């Protein structure tokens, strides 16, 4: 039975779904939206979508047969049976207005993901940090075990060459997005919570208690026979555990974890540790990712796999051979500067805790290298809300190149931009950051800043990732001709 035939069989269980043939995505170029669109294309739906710019996601969807419109317009939705929107889309978007006038159902991304999960064994991964890596690790473990899951991930899984794929089994492994509380639409069999911190607080009215309660509600979407896999190292997770009335499996470095990491060590890009599980033999593991935070992500994957009775041999092999995720401590090789070769790492982390974890991993793996960070803050609201935390963590590198805020559609907030943050870090007195007005200007500064043997870390969720790829490909005009090793 082909994948499409398998899904048509599932659709026959819901006769009403036969009415839905054409699905249009507004904002299809995002990783989450594009991933769901890719699964639906492969399930046999006629998929179209629009976005303001062409990117790798839209290019891939075109190759798969989706019709992509660059730019938004009312004509794009005329033939749609349903319109899927991301929360980043303005309600006054002409396609949304047209869909309302035509009485075409409009659903959020998470609602469509929930429909994909409805007749599958869903594994949903939530948390402030680590969702993409944890989801990727779980998908890799299940794939290694021959379970062939469907997955939807917020980043490129390097081994698959995509962030989403339609599998032939009953499993669906997906990120659960708390940024707009839409993860409450999901009804999985297994839920993972990696950690809980203050982020996207506008969604929750600035009320951290409301955010915590929403995570509890998310876990209570599990059936009574479902499993909540949670990180006991996180203090907020420990705080909400007494409120969770589902079966709980904990993981972490703590002695009271059900799935515990011991004997941690890191050398370069790889970590070694022992995992101890109740009622199971200890496993000595190699993880092809750096940092203690990634060991925690691996523990979550191990906990899920163990609950589903996946063989230990698949766990061992999948972790050792894991090829990583795009923009998650992605080693892009070395590139040449006038003063010598520099190691280049690109990372998506944009919350102070994520940046701190990345710095810690870089220090542990390459202690001899000078750490130069080019950081692009993401969103004015996040910069404002976590301003002091950003000052603290960004002061920990050896050299800081600070770009202006990537707005992600937000209006500027006085005192929460890159220049203000740069001044505040300078006043702290640990280092003298260099303000970079635009990503394009970064190339002009780097030759004077970088030294032989440096580790350059490009950090942030905005468009700085595209710049790092150009650096890796020696496209910025200051290469001395040394060989550049670009890793996927």
UniProtKB/Swiss-Prot annotation:
The keyword Cell division applies. It comes from Shewanella oneidensis (strain ATCC 700550 / JCM 31522 / CIP 106686 / LMG 19005 / NCIMB 14063 / MR-1). It catalyses: UDP-N-acetyl-alpha-D-muramate + L-alanine + ATP = UDP-N-acetyl-alpha-D-muramoyl-L-alanine + ADP + phosphate + H(+). It is found in: Cytoplasm. One of its GO terms (molecular function) is ATP binding. GO terms for cellular component: cytoplasm. Pathway: Cell wall biogenesis; peptidoglycan biosynthesis. ATP binds at residues 127-133. Its EC number is 6.3.2.8. Belongs to the MurCDEF family. Cell wall formation. This is UDP-N-acetylmuramate--L-alanine ligase. Keywords: ATP-binding, Cell cycle, Cell division, Cell shape, Cell wall biogenesis/degradation, Cytoplasm, Ligase, Nucleotide-binding, Peptidoglycan synthesis. HAMAP family: MurC. It is an enzyme of class 6 (ligase). Coiled coil: none annotated. InterPro entries: Mur-like_cat_sf, Mur_ligase_C, Mur_ligase_C_dom_sf, Mur_ligase_cen, Mur_ligase_N, MurCDEF_pg_biosynth, UDP-N-AcMur_Ala_ligase_MurC. It holds the Pfam family Mur_ligase. GO terms for biological process: cell division; cell wall organization; peptidoglycan biosynthetic process; regulation of cell shape. The gene is murC.
């Amino acid at each position: 039975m082909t994948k499409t035939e398998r899904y048509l069989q599932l659709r026959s269980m819901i006769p009403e779904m036969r009415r839905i043939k054409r699905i249009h995505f507004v904002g299809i170029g995002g990783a989450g939206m594009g991933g769901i669109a890719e699964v639906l294309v492969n399930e046999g739906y006629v998929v179209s979508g629009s976005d303001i710019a062409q990117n790798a996601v839209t290019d891939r969807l075109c190759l798969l047969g989706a019709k992509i419109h660059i730019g938004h317009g009312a004509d794009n939705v005329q033939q749609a049976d349903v319109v899927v929107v991301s929360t980043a889309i303005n309600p006054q978007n002409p396609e949304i207005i047209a869909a309302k006038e035509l009485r075409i159902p409009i659903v959020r991304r998470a609602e469509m993901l929930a429909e994909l999960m409805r007749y599958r064994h869903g594994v949903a991964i939530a948390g402030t940090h680590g969702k993409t890596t944890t989801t990727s690790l779980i998908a890799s473990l299940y794939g290694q075990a021959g379970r062939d899951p469907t997955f939807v991930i917020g980043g490129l899984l390097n081994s698959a060459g995509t962030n989403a794929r339609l599998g032939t089994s009953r499993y669906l492994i997906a990120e659960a997005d708390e940024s707009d509380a839409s993860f409450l639409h999901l009804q999985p069999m297994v839920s993972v919570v990696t950690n809980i911190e203050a982020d996207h607080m506008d969604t929750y009215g600035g009320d951290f208690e409301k955010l915590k309660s929403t995570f509890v509600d998310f876990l209570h979407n599990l059936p009574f026979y479902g499993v909540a896999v949670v990180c006991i190292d996180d203090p907020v997770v420990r705080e909400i555990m007494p409120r969770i009335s589902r079966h709980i499996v904990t993981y972490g470095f703590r002695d009271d974890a059900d799935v515990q990491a011991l004997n941690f060590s890191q050398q370069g890009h790889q970590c070694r540790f022992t995992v101890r599980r109740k009622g199971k033999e200890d496993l000595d593991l190699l993880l092809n990712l750096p940092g203690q935070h990634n060991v925690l992500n691996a523990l979550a994957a191990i906990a899920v796999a163990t609950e589903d009775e996946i063989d230990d041999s698949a766990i061992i092999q999948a972790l050792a051979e894991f090829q990583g995720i795009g923009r998650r401590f992605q080693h892009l090789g070395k590139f040449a500067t006038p003063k010598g070769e520099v190691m280049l790492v690109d990372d998506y982390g944009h919350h102070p805790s994520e940046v701190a974890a990345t710095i810690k991993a870089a220090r542990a793996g390459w202690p001899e290298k000078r750490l130069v960070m080019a950081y692009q803050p993401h969103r004015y609201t996040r910069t404002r809300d976590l301003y002091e935390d950003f000052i603290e963590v960004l002061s920990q590198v050896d050299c800081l190149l600070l770009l202006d805020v990537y707005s992600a559609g937000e209006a500027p907030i006085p005192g929460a931009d890159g220049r203000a943050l740069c001044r505040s870090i300078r006043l702290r007195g640990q280092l003298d950051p260099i303000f970079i007005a635009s990503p394009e200007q970064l190339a002009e500064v780097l030759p004077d800043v970088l030294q032989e043997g440096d580790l350059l870390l490009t950090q942030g969720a905005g468009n700085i990732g595209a710049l790092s790829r150009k650096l890796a490909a020696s496209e910025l005009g200051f290469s001395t001709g040394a060989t550049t090793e670009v890793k996927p």
